[in-house]
C-alpha cells in the first residue's frame, strides 16, 4: 500500500541503516528466540548470510555500538568478529574497512576472533567499482574474509520472513521499493525513467557487455548519469584515447588526452572527420 507511511522514507541516512542492522543482529541472539520467533529466525539467517555460513548454529550476538567509529561491529558466538561498512547511496572512501580491521586485530580482546569484513550496499553501484573495492581489499589482506552484500542479497533473506514486526516490514518494503524502481527500466518508456531506472539499465548493460563503468558526472547544468566503455588508443597517437559514453538518452564519442589538452582541438577535429567518413 503506497499510502502507508514508511519509517525509512524519512530515516534515509546510513546511521539509520546502521541502527536497523544492529537491531536485527541483536534479534539473532538466542535470548530473543521466544520473543518473536519468526523475526529471530530471520535475524539468524541474516547473520548466516553475512558470515557466508549457511549451517552456522548461532547462540550469541553481541553488538558493539560505535566502537572506534565502526558502522556496525558485532561478536557472534564469541568466535566471529563481524565488521560492516554500511552504505546507502555513497561509495567506499578512505579505506574505512582496512582501518577498522587493523584496529580490531590490534585489540587483545578481539585478536583471536575470526574476522569477517563486509561492505553492505543497499543503493546501486557499478560492478566495476565493487570489483575494484574487493580486489583492493583482498590484495592487501589475502587471508581475511571479505564480502560484498548487496540489496538483492539482503532481500533474498528478508522476504522469506513471516514476521509482522513493523520496523522489519518497513525496512523490507523500503529496499523492495528501491529494487522495483531499479528494475522499472524493463517496463517503462525511456522518457519516464527515474534516476534508479537509469542505474538499473546501466547495471544490465555492464553485465551484458562484461565491460564498462558508470556513475554520476557533475557539470554546471546539474550533472547526469553516464556509462562509458570501449576505450581505445588512436593508433597514430598513444596520448589520446577515444571511448563511447552514454549520457542517459545521448550517445557520445569522447576523446581523452593523457598528456594535457593543448592538442585537444586538433584531435577533436580529426575525430569529427573520421565520424563523417563512417
Where are these regions (language model features)?
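Short hydrophobic-acidic sequence motifs that mark active-site Asp/Glu residues
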Residues: 69-73, 81-85, 239-243, 250-252
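Conserved catalytic cores of phosphodiester-cleaving nucleases, focusing on short active-site segments
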Residues: 21, 72-74, 78-88, 100
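Active-site metal-binding core of divalent-cation-utilizing nuclease and nuclease-like domains
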Residues: 44-78, 217-221, 228-237
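Short, flexible loop/turn elements at secondary-structure junctions
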Residues: 65-67, 76, 87-90, 104, ...
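A structured, charge-rich N-terminal accessory region that forms the first stable segment of a protein
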Residues: 1-49
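Polyanion-binding interface signature
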Residues: 182-278
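Active-site-adjacent loop/helix micro-motif of nuclease/hydrolase catalytic cores
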Residues: 90-99, 261-267
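Gly/Pro-rich interdomain helix-loop hinge
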Residues: 95, 99, 105-222
Amino acid at each position: 500500500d503506497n499510502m502507508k507511511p514508511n519509517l525509512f522514507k524519512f530515516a534515509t541516512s546510513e546511521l539509520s541503516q546502521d541502527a536497523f542492522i544492529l537491531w536485527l543482529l541483536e534479534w539473532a541472539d538466542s535470548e530473543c528466540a521466544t520473543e518473536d520467533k519468526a523475526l529471530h529466525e530471520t535475524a539468524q539467517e541474516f547473520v548466516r548470510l553475512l558470515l557466508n555460513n549457511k549451517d552456522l548454529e548461532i547462540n550469541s550476538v553481541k553488538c558493539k555500538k560505535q566502537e572506534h567509529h565502526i558502522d556496525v561491529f558485532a561478536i557472534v558466538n564469541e568466535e566471529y568478529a563481524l565488521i560492516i561498512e554500511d552504505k546507502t547511496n555513497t561509495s567506499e572512501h578512505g579505506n574505512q574497512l582496512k582501518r577498522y580491521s587493523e584496529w580490531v586485530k590490534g585489540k587483545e580482546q578481539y585478536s583471536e576472533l575470526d574476522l569477517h569484513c563486509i561492505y553492505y550496499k543497499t543503493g546501486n553501484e557499478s560492478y566495476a567499482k565493487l570489483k575494484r573495492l574487493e580486489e583492493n581489499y583482498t590484495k592487501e589482506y589475502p587471508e581475511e574474509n571479505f564480502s560484498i552484500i548487496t540489496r538483492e542479497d539482503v532481500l533474498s533473506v528478508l522476504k522469506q520472513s513471516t514476521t509482522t514486526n513493523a520496523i522489519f516490514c518497513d525496512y523490507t518494503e523500503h529496499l523492495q521499493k528501491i529494487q522495483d524502481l531499479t528494475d522499472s527500466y524493463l517496463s517503462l518508456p525511456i522518457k519516464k525513467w527515474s534516476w534508479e531506472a537509469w542505474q538499473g539499465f546501466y547495471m544490465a548493460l555492464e553485465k551484458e557487455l562484461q565491460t564498462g563503468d558508470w556513475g554520476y558526472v557533475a557539470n554546471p547544468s546539474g550533472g547526469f548519469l553516464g556509462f562509458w566503455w570501449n576505450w581505445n588508443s588512436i593508433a597514430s597517437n598513444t596520448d589520446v584515447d577515444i571511448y563511447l559514453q552514454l549520457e542517459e538518452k545521448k550517445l557520445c564519442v569522447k576523446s581523452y588526452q593523457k598528456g594535457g589538452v593543448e592538442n585537444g582541438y586538433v584531435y577533436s577535429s580529426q575525430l569529427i572527420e573520421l565520424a563523417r567518413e563512417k
